[in-house]
A protein has these predicted regions:
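Hydrophobic alpha-helical segments
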Residues: 1-219
């Protein structure tokens, strides 16, 4: 209802500000941290539409898949922010206390999101995630450097390595995300197919059909 419309309006407003932000970046009139925060805010408003949509879903399989996808996308977004913040610190050759805390927050925030996804996702998507999407040893080593000490000056070599490793992980996460989207669409199409006879009968029968119990899931 009105809450969903408000979420959509906020997201549209944030999207409308992207050209001005890109122009500032092109003219180097905005700090990297501020630009990253603005991009993250746009994505956050887009993602926040999902909980409002979920409030209108009465079918448990569809609701579960929606929450699994939403949780996964939240985790994936935090991985993207981790990539950006780490690349910034390694490029500069130092991590300020503020930048380091932001990085730690993004790393710590990923696990609850992915735990929620694994509790609700299909066995196939969960297995794919566990097989290829965890941060590998190379990423963990660079995380320790970023979070505990200052990196050595190497002309940006570590920054490129960090960015490449995180990009590879994001591509693997995208593969799982696409499967989650397919799962949600399949469940939705199945629900529509099952409900079609009921819609036709409803034109001749004014009785109220019992509604499915809604599973309340934290987002």
């Amino acid at each position: 209802g009105s809450a969903l419309c408000w979420r959509i309006a906020r997201a549209v407003d944030e999207l409308a500000q992207l050209p001005a932000l890109r122009a500032q970046i092109g003219r180097r009139q905005i700090a990297a941290e501020a630009a990253t925060e603005q991009f993250s805010r746009v994505i956050r408003h887009l993602l926040n539409i999902a909980p409002q949509l979920n409030d209108s879903i009465d079918d448990p399989p569809v609701a579960g898949r929606m929450v699994a996808l939403y949780s996964f996308m939240q985790g994936k977004e935090l991985v993207g922010q981790e990539r950006a913040l780490g690349a910034l610190g390694f490029t500069r050759g130092e991590f300020s206390d503020s930048l380091r805390q932001q990085l730690v927050d993004r790393i710590d925030g990923q696990q609850p999101c992915f735990d929620s996804f694994q509790a609700l996702g299909s066995p196939a998507t969960v297995q794919l995630f566990r097989t290829q999407c965890h941060a590998g040893l190379d990423i963990e080593q660079l995380r320790r450097i970023a979070c505990t000490r200052q990196p050595a000056a190497d002309g940006g070599e570590t920054a490129l390595r960090w960015f490449g490793l995180q990009t590879q992980r994001l591509e693997q996460l995208r593969e799982v995300e696409e499967q989650l989207i397919d799962d949600l669409l399949d469940a939705t199409y199945a629900l529509l197919a099952d409900d079609a006879p009921g819609w036709q009968a409803g034109e001749e029968d004014d009785s109220v059909m019992p509604r499915l119990d809604k599973q309340l899931l934290p987002l």
